[in-house]
Regions:
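Conserved SAM/AdoMet-binding glycine-rich loop
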Residues: 1-120
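Auxiliary Fe-S-binding modules of radical SAM enzymes
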Residues: 31-34, 46, 96-106, 115, ...
Length: 167
């Protein structure tokens, strides 16, 4: 779940395709075979959190009803600049599915403020997303350049530290 076969599944040998497990199947196998252990996994990117995983989580009492779902921004414009693979609407739809299938599920997030070119309107979209989701807790960070990333190479860090901290 993440790298490896997932990225090149169509190019994989047929035997690999036939024997491959997706994360939902693996999670269910472990939950069923080890009912006395408590299972928790962390940080699933929104585009990787499937309805099948959510259903498996709801089915087994030994799987913690907690999902860390990094969103980074509530603005589609900023998400695109960050090269994130989800949109605001897709994130809302995912949250709605989680709340419907596992009403008691705890949801946490990661958020970055002050990404290059972020406007007050972009920031307000992020605040409205936070209000909608009603997270249990989250991790907030101010943007800082990471060497080697596209943002560091191509974008000017044009948001002042004062504004980043206020947001």
């Amino acid at each position: 779940y993440g790298g490896g076969l997932k990225k090149d599944f169509e190019k994989a040998p047929e035997i690999n395709k036939k024997t491959a497990l997706n994360f939902a199947n693996l999670l269910e196998m472990i939950a069923r075979s080890k009912p006395k252990i408590r299972i928790r996994f962390s940080t699933s990117n929104p585009q990787d959190m499937t309805i099948d995983v959510i259903k498996v989580m709801s089915k087994y009492p030994n799987i913690c009803k907690s999902i860390h779902l990094p969103v980074q921004s509530g603005s589609d414009r900023i998400l695109k600049k960050m090269n994130r693979l989800h949109t605001r609407e897709e994130y809302f739809n995912l949250i709605d599915k989680i709340r419907k299938i596992i009403p008691e599920c705890s949801i946490s997030y990661d958020m970055i403020t002050g990404f290059p070119t972020e406007t007050e309107d972009d920031h307000n979209l992020t605040l409205s997303l936070i209000d909608y989701v009603k997270y249990d807790f989250g991790y907030m960070f101010t943007y800082s350049e990471r060497p080697g990333t596209l943002a560091a190479k191509k974008m000017e860090d044009n948001i002042s530290l004062k504004v980043k901290k206020r947001r």
